[in-house]
């Protein structure tokens, strides 16, 4: 799957889950599971409930996503 196939959406973290997984509520109201991307993990970027994040989704499974950016 190429980088053009992903869907980027904005959302808000509503809950921390084990193994660097988070429950994210998107702008359109959908709730999904998001995990931290490798670069964010490598640079020790902390994500807390209430943070605004950018999530990448695949067209195949819209219930899971990758958190790629945390807004300040």
Curated annotation (Swiss-Prot):
Keywords: Cytoplasm, Initiation factor, Protein biosynthesis, RNA-binding, rRNA-binding
Subcellular location, record wording: Cytoplasm
GO CC annotation, single: cytosol
CDD domains attached to this UniProt entry: S1_IF1 (cd04451)
Residue span, S1-like domain: 1-72
UniProt key word Kinase: no
Chief localization: cytoplasm
UniProt entry tagged with the keyword Cell membrane: no
UniProt cross-references to PROSITE patterns, sorted A to Z: S1_IF1_TYPE
Molecular function as annotated in GO: ribosome binding; rRNA binding; translation initiation factor activity
Reported function: One of the essential components for the initiation of protein synthesis. Stabilizes the binding of IF-2 and IF-3 on the 30S subunit to which N-formylmethionyl-tRNA(fMet) subsequently binds. Helps modulate mRNA selection, yielding the 30S pre-initiation complex (PIC). Upon addition of the 50S ribosomal subunit IF-1, IF-2 and IF-3 are released leaving the mature 70S translation initiation complex.
Subunit structure as annotated in this protein's UniProt entry: Component of the 30S ribosomal translation pre-initiation complex which assembles on the 30S ribosome in the order IF-2 and IF-3, IF-1 and N-formylmethionyl-tRNA(fMet); mRNA recruitment can occur at any time during PIC assembly.
Annotated family: Belongs to the IF-1 family.
Protein name per Swiss-Prot or TrEMBL: Translation initiation factor IF-1 1
The organism of origin for this protein: Thiobacillus denitrificans (strain ATCC 25259 / T1)
């Amino acid at each position: 799957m190429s980088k053009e196939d992903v869907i980027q959406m904005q959302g808000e973290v509503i809950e921390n889950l084990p193994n660097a997984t988070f429950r994210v509520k998107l702008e359109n109201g959908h709730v999904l599971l998001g995990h931290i991307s490798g670069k964010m993990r490598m640079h020790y970027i902390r994500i807390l409930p209430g943070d605004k994040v950018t999530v990448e989704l695949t067209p195949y499974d819209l219930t899971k996503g990758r958190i790629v950016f945390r807004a300040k």
